[in-house]
């Protein structure tokens, strides 16, 4: 406490200092310290890295157990960041390719589905944030304690496979953008290397604080928004058709594949793990019910705004290609590789050629998604395996997992657009297969009182979440079946696929069967004190 004899200058200095200092140690903080010493686990963010949420209501609000402060724009700003990083997965090159194909083949008719798919994605991501805030641990850490060793190693492997598949798409998307912006001078493999090095450069900013890294993402999202909004303005889409597409549900038999792609891109397995870790970048005491409730409120607002922005960006891309290519002979052949060429032929040059505007937006999408992919890889590997490594070491390991196969892919498929399209389909299938292994553990944990305490979801929300999860899994299952029927040839290959399917379904049944069981002893022991404290 400041001395009464101090002048106004000293009070101002203390206020400035208070805005940067950590919250005072309380009994719960000491309890957390003891817990971390006992467990010595890998954590998403060290205490010194976390952003302090400074109270503006007065000292009484800090100690009050059930006092939830009124809404504050300043606090909303302090909580802003994780939701926008999470929203990058809704804007990666794979999603942009789904947008342009939906627009070219289905016109404006699937915009309503894009809207509701984004809403479904928002619900899943809010549950992910809820787990991270209420428990003080992220999803991969909780899975490590919830499941037996063999099951968690399978979950870790599946999460890594999904991440590598997404990363290959994202890095190649950046490489395509670099190829466009260099007028074809740089080949795909060179773009892959540039993207990899840029990713490490951006991650270096994390050493200067989480806020700096979040600022970089804000610039990249703004770049995407401006680029694709500019393209939409150049295309001059029909406002009437746009509104009809958003408000009136329509689904034709010829657009089912595109509809499946729109919904299937909503849930990215690595993003479910990522968001539960990102919310821990703010200093929140999970043992104080009011603090957790306040954080959940602000994170819900921030995530909603972030995904509204992502919806608008996806809307811009879809409408540009709906206006320019719907009903044309080129519609069925447009992909991420040749989209720039088709845009240039359709809309021409001008003061700012649309080809380069598309390249800038695609580059921002690719760069931002590769950074979040590396970020997610650190949390997934550290959480499942409990690796206490330096962040640069973890980044190097997780980056190598994706960059090496991506360079091989870029060299092999450098000159073949058709081969890249087939590869992209296989990667979509690969990621679709991993969705249950992120959704089922999330919904299992978020509904358990032993894990969540008073913040477990209620029966209505639980049924809604499971309905969405089953819907997404079935839709992606349709994509898998359709793909395998058309692509899988030969008896031996069919036998291998069939055997793998049996093992795949068996593991999903095992995960679902765990929904009603109690968590492991280690997790129960750690969380029993939190439940008691939250109930006070």
UniProtKB/Swiss-Prot annotation:
Gene name tied to this protein: NRAMP2
Family per similarity comment: Belongs to the NRAMP (TC 2.A.55) family.
Region Disordered, residue ranges: 1-37
Job description of the protein: Probable divalent metal transporter.
Biased composition range(s): Low complexity: 22-36
Membrane-crossing segments per the record: 76-96, 104-124, 161-181, 185-205, 213-233, 259-279, 305-325, 347-367, 400-420, 435-455, 465-485, 492-512
Single annotated GO MF: manganese ion transmembrane transporter activity
Subcellular location(s) of the protein: Membrane
GO term, biological process aspect, one: manganese ion transport
Entries under InterPro entries matching the protein: NRAMP_fam
Protein name: Metal transporter Nramp2
């Amino acid at each position: 406490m400041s001395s009464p004899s101090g002048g106004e200058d000293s009070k101002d200095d203390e206020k400035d200092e208070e805005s940067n200092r950590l919250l005072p140690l309380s009994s719960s903080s000491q309890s957390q310290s003891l817990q971390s010493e006992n467990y010595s686990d890998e954590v998403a963010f060290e205490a010194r890295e976390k952003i302090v949420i400074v109270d503006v209501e007065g000292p009484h609000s800090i100690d009050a157990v059930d006092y939830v402060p009124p809404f504050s724009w300043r606090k909303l700003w302090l909580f802003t960041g994780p939701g926008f990083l999470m929203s990058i997965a809704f804007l990666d090159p794979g999603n942009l390719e789904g947008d342009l194909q939906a627009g070219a083949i289905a016109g404006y008719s699937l915009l309503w589905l894009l809207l509701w798919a984004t809403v479904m994605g928002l619900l899943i991501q809010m549950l992910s944030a809820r787990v991270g805030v209420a428990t003080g641990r992220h999803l991969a850490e909780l899975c490590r304690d919830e499941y037996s060793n063999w099951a968690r190693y399978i979950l870790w492997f599946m999460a890594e496979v999904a991440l590598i598949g997404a990363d290959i798409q994202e890095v190649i998307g950046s490489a395509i953008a670099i190829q466009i912006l260099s007028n074809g001078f740089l080949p795909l493999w060179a773009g892959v290397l540039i993207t990899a090095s840029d990713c490490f450069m951006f991650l270096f900013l994390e050493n200067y604080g989480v806020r700096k890294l979040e600022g970089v993402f804000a610039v990249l999202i703004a770049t995407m928004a401006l680029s694709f909004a500019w393209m939409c303005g150049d295309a001059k889409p029909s406002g009437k058709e746009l509104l009809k597409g958003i408000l009136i549900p329509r689904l034709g038999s010829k657009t089912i594949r595109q509809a499946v792609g729109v919904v299937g891109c909503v849930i990215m397995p690595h993003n479910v793990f990522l968001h539960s870790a990102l919310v821990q970048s703010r200093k929140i005491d999970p043992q104080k019910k009011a603090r957790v409730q306040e954080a959940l409120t602000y994170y819900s607002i921030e995530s909603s705004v972030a995904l509204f922005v992502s919806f608008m960006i996806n809307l811009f891309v879809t409408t540009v290609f709906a206006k320019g290519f719907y009903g044309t002979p080129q519609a069925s052949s447009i992909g991420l590789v040749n989209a720039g060429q088709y845009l240039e032929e359709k809309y021409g040059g001008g003061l700012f050629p649309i080809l380069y505007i598309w390249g800038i937006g695609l580059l921002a999408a690719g760069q931002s998604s590769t950074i979040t992919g590396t970020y997610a890889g650190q949390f997934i590997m550290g959480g499942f395996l409990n690796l206490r490594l330096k962040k640069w070491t973890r980044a190097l390991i997780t980056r190598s997992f994706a960059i090496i196969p991506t360079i091989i892919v870029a060299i092999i498929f450098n000159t073949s657009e058709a081969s890249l399209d087939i590869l992209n389909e296989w990667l979509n299938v690969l990621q679709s297969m991993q969705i249950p292994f992120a959704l089922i553990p999330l919904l299992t944990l978020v509904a358990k009182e032993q894990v969540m305490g008073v913040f477990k979801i209620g029966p209505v929300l639980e049924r809604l979440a499971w309905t969405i999860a089953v819907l997404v899994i079935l839709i992606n299952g349709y994509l898998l079946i359709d793909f395998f029927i058309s692509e899988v040839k030969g008896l031996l290959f069919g036998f291998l696929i069939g055997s793998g399917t049996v093992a795949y379904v068996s593991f999903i049944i095992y995960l679902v069967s765990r929904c009603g069981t109690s968590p492991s002893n280690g997790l129960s022991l750690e969380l029993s004190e939190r439940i008691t404290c939250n109930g006070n």
